[in-house]
Amino acid sequence: MSRIGKKPVAIPSGIEVKVDGNVLKFKKGNAQKELDTKNHVDVKVEDGKVEFSPKGEDRQSMAFWGTYRALAHNIVVGLTDGFSKQLEINGVGYKAAMKGKILELTLGYSHLVNYEVPDGIEISVDKNVITIKGTDKQQVGQVAAIIRDFRAPEPYKGKGVKYLEEHIIRKAGKTAKK
């Protein structure tokens, strides 16, 4: 049974929440987010809290109960604080620069790698650190993963794009015969 689903989601001041059928609508200023529960859970908004309850007693309803509660919590955190991920570029000649809405990466290929930044995401570059910010946790993580995949870190010298807190396990190189 879900323990996450039991906890109500606290709504901080400045965020409006409405239930419209199966859709939960969050609004803060001009930013709006929607969560479609697809009729898997019951939603109640009262006393500055959003409470979820399962539609049935089957396993699937219980799984959706915790999932939708976590998604709603992520929307609230995204609208209040936002989410961010940091990537680090390691390697001789490897660099990044923002040119308008395009992230331009030099990663040791014979060509530049250009990545168009999607709406709702802000990217800033400071020396060899790329900072990705946004209100949608899934989108921030997806953009970070896409940028990392352009040149994933290799295990011998550690060259490539890695998450700032990621530890790359290094391998020993070839040893000469004696």
From Swiss-Prot:
Pfam families: Ribosomal_L6. This is Large ribosomal subunit protein uL6. The keyword Ribosomal protein applies. The gene is rplF. Keywords: Ribonucleoprotein, Ribosomal protein, RNA-binding, rRNA-binding. One of its GO terms (biological process) is cytoplasmic translation. This protein binds to the 23S rRNA, and is important in its secondary structure. It is located near the subunit interface in the base of the L7/L12 stalk, and near the tRNA binding site of the peptidyltransferase center. The keyword rRNA-binding applies. One of its GO terms (cellular component) is cytosolic large ribosomal subunit. Part of the 50S ribosomal subunit. Transmembrane segments: none annotated. It comes from the Bacteria. InterPro entries: Ribosomal_uL6-like, Ribosomal_uL6-like_a/b-dom_sf, Ribosomal_uL6_a/b-dom, Ribosomal_uL6_bac-type, Ribosomal_uL6_CS. GO terms for molecular function: rRNA binding; structural constituent of ribosome. Belongs to the universal ribosomal protein uL6 family.
